[in-house]
């Protein structure tokens, strides 16, 4: 599922598959300038050619009479024209600059709320300022070219929203209700309009339609069938009456005109928090935002793990093995195989992963779970060659140890265990988050050791979980792996899940191995 989150435009490339973030780069500017130059050259050369070969007046008159009457281009939507003209004075471009030199690092959009000096945008537009306020500073540019300072007031990482204060006030076009029940209900197919500054080319409006709430996202998002481009992150999406429907946030890279919005109800809730405690908001230091982001991520991981374990893991059969998976609205599973008579070995692979993750920074997305199972067998390879093949695969799937300034060095433990007639090697590694002390990445990898020409490798990855929840899920995953009848395995998994849910108290959790992140 290739998606693009509408990030502030920056000089870095979009992130990996998933909701990727819309950035502008210097190369984009170059391509645009090059295209413009070529168009000018073509126009000039066309004019010169016309001067060299002029059509006689009589011939021109005859040609005009013979030529079919040209049809005018369709007029642009009058609704879009009127909305843009009414809204333009309250649209802003949000720029993130390096403090040292005040050079542009990234660009997004935002909108003034009512007649206040509060502006709504995306968290990912302001993430650099929230995480590294000593390095980055913000400014706004309005549709008339006026500039001013930007002060970050509040963030909602889970829904990708932020509220900032600027040095000017709105005209009152973008009205946000005080309560969520005052928001207009959207109906599928109705026209919506997204506004922002795409590609740093200038302010624009795009027209599309509303097509429901995305069921596979962990938090509600709206599907907008219309174009949204880099730099429109944080811009408003409104209905034909100018009422807020949502905030531009991302688009799908694998489809046409499949874009996503943060629902307006989350805008209302964040503004309520800002307006309810203005003194506390004003007194916040830059360090408070890192702590607040950590608190929200911790809240997400609790919800994520509880959702994962709210019912027993599903069990699927791969040859003689029973393997745990989770299929839900938030997690999808895919399979592939290389079954062909000429292959020296055959594999079947299952991959399950969450459809979304939480954006913290361009380098860090977290709050994510994935499960992989890789079953191989061979008749043509001898046991030695087959064993070597699986050793190489095991090492390749471990991903190696990479240095990462955001995480601590991995602390790993390895054990050989017997579980439900299945002997296996298990390696678990844990890395801590440097900025967020209570969060860890867990990686658990297993390899069966019970057969010479048949092999199962499994992997569980948990990103951004507490140490207690990480060990809790890893223990349950290990207990669910094994052999035996499907009914017996399902019963076993159900009991294991129930026991794990009863052991939510960290003091009751018994770790399968003594692992601490350094």
Where are these regions (language model features)?
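N-terminal activation segment of mature serine protease catalytic domains
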Residues: 51-111, 122, 277-339
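Conserved active-site neighborhood of the chymotrypsin/trypsin-like protease fold
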Residues: 114-195, 200-203, 218-221
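Secretory pathway targeting signatures of secreted, lumenal, and periplasmic proteins
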Residues: 331-387
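Active-site region of chymotrypsin-like
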Residues: 87-103, 167-178, 201-279
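Surface-exposed amphipathic alpha-helical segments
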Residues: 268, 278, 330-331, 444, ...
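Signature of long, low-cysteine stretches enriched in small and polar/charged residues
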Residues: 388-449
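N-terminal targeting leaders that route proteins to membranes or the secretory/organellar pathways
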Residues: 20-82, 118, 479-487, 492-498, ...
């Amino acid at each position: 599922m290739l998606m693009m989150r509408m990030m502030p435009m920056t000089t870095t490339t979009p992130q990996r598959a998933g909701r990727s973030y819309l950035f502008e780069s210097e190369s984009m500017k170059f391509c645009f300038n090059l295209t413009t130059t070529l168009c000018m050259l073509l126009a000039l050369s066309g004019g010169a050619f016309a001067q060299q070969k002029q059509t006689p007046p009589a011939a021109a008159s005859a040609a005009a009479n013979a030529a079919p009457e040209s049809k005018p281009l369709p007029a642009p939507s009058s609704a879009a024209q009127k909305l843009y003209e009414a809204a333009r004075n309250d649209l802003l471009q949000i720029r993130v600059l390096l403090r040292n030199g005040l050079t542009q690092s990234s660009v997004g959009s935002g909108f003034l709320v009512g007649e206040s000096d509060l502006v709504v945008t995306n968290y990912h537009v302001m993430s650099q300022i929230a995480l590294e306020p000593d390095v980055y500073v913000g400014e706004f540019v309005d549709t008339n070219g006026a500039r001013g300072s930007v002060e970050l007031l509040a963030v909602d990482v889970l829904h990708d929203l932020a509220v900032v204060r600027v040095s000017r006030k709105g005209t009152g076009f973008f009205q946000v209700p005080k309560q969520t029940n005052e928001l207009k209900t959207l109906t599928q197919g109705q026209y919506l309009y997204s506004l922002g500054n795409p590609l740093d080319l200038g302010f624009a409006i795009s027209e599309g339609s509303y097509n429901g709430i995305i069921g596979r996202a962990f938090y509600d998002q709206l599907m907008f069938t219309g174009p949204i481009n880099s730099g429109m992150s944080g811009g408003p999406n409104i209905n034909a009456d100018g009422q807020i429907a949502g905030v531009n946030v991302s688009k799908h890279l694998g489809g046409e005109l499949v874009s996503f919005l943060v629902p307006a109800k989350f805008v209302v809730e964040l503004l309520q928090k800002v307006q309810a405690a203005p003194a506390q908001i004003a007194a916040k230091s830059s360090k408070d935002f890192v702590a607040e982001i950590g608190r929200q991520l911790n809240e997400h991981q609790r919800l994520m793990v509880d959702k994962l374990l709210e019912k027993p893991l599903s069990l699927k059969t791969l040859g003689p093995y029973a393997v745990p998976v989770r299929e839900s609205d938030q997690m999808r599973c895919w399979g592939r195989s290389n079954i062909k008579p000429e292959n020296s070995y055959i594999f079947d692979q299952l991959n399950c992963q969450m459809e979304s993750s939480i954006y913290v920074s361009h380098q860090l997305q977290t709050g994510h779970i994935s499960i992989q199972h890789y079953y191989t067998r061979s008749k043509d390879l001898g046991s030695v060659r087959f064993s070597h093949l699986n050793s190489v695969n095991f090492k390749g799937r471990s991903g190696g140890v990479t240095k990462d300034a955001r995480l601590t060095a991995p602390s790993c433990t390895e054990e050989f265990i017997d579980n439900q007639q299945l002997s296996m090697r298990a390696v678990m590694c844990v890395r801590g988050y440097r900025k967020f002390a209570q969060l860890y990445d867990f990686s658990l990898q297993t390899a069966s050791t019970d057969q010479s020409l048949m092999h199962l490798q499994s992997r569980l990855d948990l990103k951004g979980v507490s140490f207690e929840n990480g060990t809790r899920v890893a223990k349950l995953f290990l207990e669910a792996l094994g052999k035996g009848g499907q009914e017996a395995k399902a019963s076993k998994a159900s009991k294991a899940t129930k026991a794990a849910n009863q052991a939510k108290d960290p003091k009751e959790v018994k770790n399968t191995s003594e692992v601490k992140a350094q």
